Swiss-Prot record:
It is found in: Cytoplasm. Pathway: Cell wall biogenesis; peptidoglycan biosynthesis. ATP binds at G115, A116, H117, G118, K119, T120, T121. Its EC number is 6.3.2.8. This is UDP-N-acetylmuramate--L-alanine ligase. GO terms for biological process: cell division; cell wall organization; peptidoglycan biosynthetic process; regulation of cell shape. The gene is murC. One of its GO terms (molecular function) is UDP-N-acetylmuramate-L-alanine ligase activity. InterPro entries: Mur-like_cat_sf (IPR036565), Mur_ligase_C (IPR004101), Mur_ligase_C_dom_sf (IPR036615), Mur_ligase_cen (IPR013221), Mur_ligase_N (IPR000713), MurCDEF_pg_biosynth (IPR050061), UDP-N-AcMur_Ala_ligase_MurC (IPR005758). The keyword Cell division applies. It catalyses: UDP-N-acetyl-alpha-D-muramate + L-alanine + ATP = UDP-N-acetyl-alpha-D-muramoyl-L-alanine + ADP + phosphate + H(+). Belongs to the MurCDEF family.
Length: 465
């Protein structure tokens, strides 16, 4: 659907409290639209939007939507949602979140960042670099940037940086000038009828929708992207630790929670020395993707390096929350949004490198029954890498329970040795008491998951022995 900006003055957002729709609403507000919205309950996102002028109600009874010029909804909104049904009855144009985003991006030189893992940090890091280089970008990413405390910005520059979502295939609405893919993994397969090859072909379609004179940036360390790269008709730039990557990461080392490495590239006679205030080889890859794009747009090199060095990260991405006070010392609390086995593996590796002598306690809240079922073996394998596992019940994210895909099913799949160092906590509110009992001074406690696990952070950090 094409938007006529002359008649679209009032947009209603269903599920406005979600990170994706709230970011879109913020951009619409800053572009002068009247924004109304609805959700089931208030949160930090709705509070931020209300301060910006959004009119929000906390129910879905269908009364608020009928005066809007168009309505935007996310994949979390079901077909029987009263507001969705009311909009259809009133013949109000309905756009998916990704469709509205793609319409906004058409006004700019657009950069879309896709991938199973790392796209939020990469798009956030890229947005920060463009701001630091005075390119005054507009951006919309899938997390709250720690420096600006917002997932979105409207600038006066030529560039629009956005996270591209494969979870509902809505990245196919986009036709970017530059497309980035960090990796491809077997996630969100329900969107693709359980067919990984269909997921892969959809990524190819997305990349082939890049502008004819555009650029595709791919991580060559990913075997699927390595397979895809020669098939594309667009100009391809590759990056990675791989020896044949055009932008190649070398001499990586981690010092505490900082990363140091060099990037060899065709554009430079000497390697680029990069410092990041973030741990993990996965973040070195994210920074290398940013460097490749910076070269495409001819960004000032000192500004690029400064932006990488001082990028403070994205909320819930290896975020240090504080210390939990124990009777005889403290334990450090870290929160991370990762909910796929490969993301958990990267988080644990970064934490091990930062604190090699300290015990790792992983508190994991599985996200979706379908993902738990599809990746059960992979979860069991990666969870065994922690010193102690505290397993919460699956966060449903709106799914109905699936037999054999809950927390107890995960434990039953574990080896006897792993099961003996696992504590199952069915109710999130019981977590502070459990951690007080099992934690030891100097423990690193990682709260891992994309559900509501973060809501317990305040209680943990303020818990006294």
């Amino acid at each position: 659907m094409q938007l006529d900006k002359k008649i679209i003055n009032h947009v209603h957002c269903l599920g406005i409290g979600g990170i994706g729709v709230s970011a879109l609403a913020e951009i619409l507000l800053k572009k002068g639209c009247r924004v109304t919205g609805s959700d089931v309950s208030p949160n930090k996102n709705t509070e931020r939007l209300q301060r910006l002028g959004a009119e929000i109600i906390f129910n879905h009874d269908g009364t608020a939507i009928t005066q809007a010029d168009c309505a935007v909804y996310s994949s979390a909104i079901g077909a029987t949602n009263p507001e969705l049904m009311a909009a259809k009855q009133a013949k109000i144009p309905l756009l998916k979140r990704g469709e509205m985003l793609a319409n906004l991006m058409k006004e700019y030189q657009s950069i879309a960042v896709a991938g199973a893992h790392g796209k939020t940090t990469t798009s956030g890091m890229l947005s920060h670099a463009f701001v630091e280089a005075n390119l005054d970008p507009t951006f919309m990413v899938g997390g709250v940037l720690n420096n600006s405390q917002t997932p979105a910005r409207v600038g006066n520059g030529h560039y629009f940086i956005a996270e591209a979502d494969e979870s509902d295939a809505s990245f196919l609405f986009m036709h970017p000038d530059i497309a980035v893919v960090t990796n491809i993994d077997a996630d969100h397969l329900s969107t693709y009828d359980g067919d990984f090859n269909r997921l892969k072909q959809t990524y190819i379609q997305f990349l082939e929708q890049t502008a004819q004179d555009g650029v595709v940036v791919l991580c060559l360390d990913d075997p699927i992207l390595r397979e895809i790269a020669p098939l594309l008709s667009r100009r391809v730039i590759t990056y990675g630790f791989s020896s044949d990557a055009q932008y190649r990461v070398v001499d990586y080392c981690q010092q505490g929670i900082q990363s140091l490495f060099q990037i060899h590239s065709p554009q430079r006679k000497a390697p680029l020395t990069v410092k990041l205030s973030m741990p993990g080889q996965h973040n070195a890859l994210n920074a290398t993707a940013v460097t490749a794009i910076a070269d495409v747009v001819r960004m000032n090199e000192p500004a690029l390096l400064k932006s990488l060095a001082d990028f403070p990260g994205v909320d819930r991405r290896f975020t240090i929350r504080g210390e939990m006070i124990l009777p005889k010392g403290n334990a450090l609390i870290i929160e991370d949004y990762g909910h796929h086995p490969n993301e958990i593996k990267a988080t644990l590796a970064a934490a091990r490198a930062a604190w090699p002598e300290r015990r790792m306690v992983l508190v994991f809240q599985p996200h979706r029954y379908s993902r738990t079922r599809d990746l059960m073996t992979e979860f069991v394998s990666v969870l065994a890498e922690t010193d102690w596992l505290v397993l919460l019940e699956v966060y449903s994210a709106g799914e109905m329970p699936i037999p054999g895909a809950d927390g107890m099913a995960l434990i039953k799949m574990m080896s006897n040795g792993m099961a003996q160092k696992t504590t199952f906590v069915p109710l999130l509110q019981n977590l502070p008491e459990t951690l007080q009992k099992l934690s030891q001074p100097n423990d690193i406690i990682i709260l891992q998951g994309a559900g509501n696990i973060g809501s317990i952070v305040t209680a943990l950090v303020q818990t006294h022995g």
